[in-house]
Amino acid sequence: MAIHYFFENSKKPKFITASWKKLLKAVTDDENHKLRNVNYIFCNDEFLYAINSEYLNHHTYTDIITFDNSERPKEIEGDLYISLERTADNAAKFYVTHAHETARVMIHGIMHLCGYKDKNPDDIAIMREKEEYYLQKYFSEILD
């Protein structure tokens, strides 16, 4: 099991700690997936915009892009790019802390690696339900 943090054009916030890795591993365990290798690459808006444009042909800002590198069912490997500028803006918009919103987005990426989608209203509702469930179950004590 390996979760790695990398920072591109972005400074590491104090709230992102090694202990979060255990909590994210617990999420994958609850979803009956084996965590192999997940890289969280934290960056700024422009860095993620460039990735979104180049690889997905989307010319918009986003909070996360998940690249699923899994080779076997129920085994998780991937690269998750997260804009800390976008999570900070969204935190203010949703009246939550930056740590809370970043944890939610990190869980969101894990849910994608577990096979959840968010392209239609029903899928979005399921994704939001999962995010909230795992935020409450594993992150509530450290985010309060």
Give a label for each model feature.
Residues 1-103, 114-144:
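An acidic/histidine-cluster motif and surrounding catalytic segment
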Residues 111:
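Conserved ATP-binding N-box helix of the HATPase_c
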